[in-house]
Amino acid sequence: MSVADDISDDALVQRFPGEAITHDNAAHYRGRLRRELLLNRCADCGRWHAPPKPICPDCWSSAVSAEPVRGDGVIFMAILLHRGPPAPGVDYSTPYPVVTVELDEQSGLRFTSTVVGADNDDIRIGAAVRLDWADRAGAPIPVFALKEPRA
């Protein structure tokens, strides 16, 4: 058992200030402490879904649990923010990329974050990405990196 599994709910909320941690998503934040991206999967129909919900939106089963995903996929949508709410580690002096990635685990399974280690000109729809991690305010957050940056 890891430290992430032993952490109390109150301590979990303190590790991720400003995040809305609930009964339905606490396992996902514990996974982040292990640098593991967890998304809900239904035990009855096998479908993945995000964001976390207590009931499968496909078959209405309550047999859902947080399971790890690899985090490989393609950029489905990309925008550059020039302004936004204050957030640890976010610098709006240069446009800040926000992407929605369609994950390889299932068609239509999407996760939104940012891309790190790439020029904004290289962040484009259809680009292949892999899961990476960044530390923000002392807590790990899932981000994406381009698999093959443009030459």
Give the location of each predicted region:
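Cys/His-coordinated zinc-binding microdomains
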Residues: 46, 60
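Well-ordered alpha/beta subsegment
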Residues: 106, 111-151
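Cys/His-enriched microdomains
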Residues: 40-43, 54, 124
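Short functional micro-motifs and their immediate structural scaffolds
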Residues: 50, 63-65
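A broadly conserved sequence feature marking short terminus-proximal activation segments
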Residues: 1-37, 106, 146-147
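Short metal-coordination and nucleic-acid-contact micro-motifs, chiefly zinc-binding Cys/His arrays
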Residues: 35-38, 52, 69-71
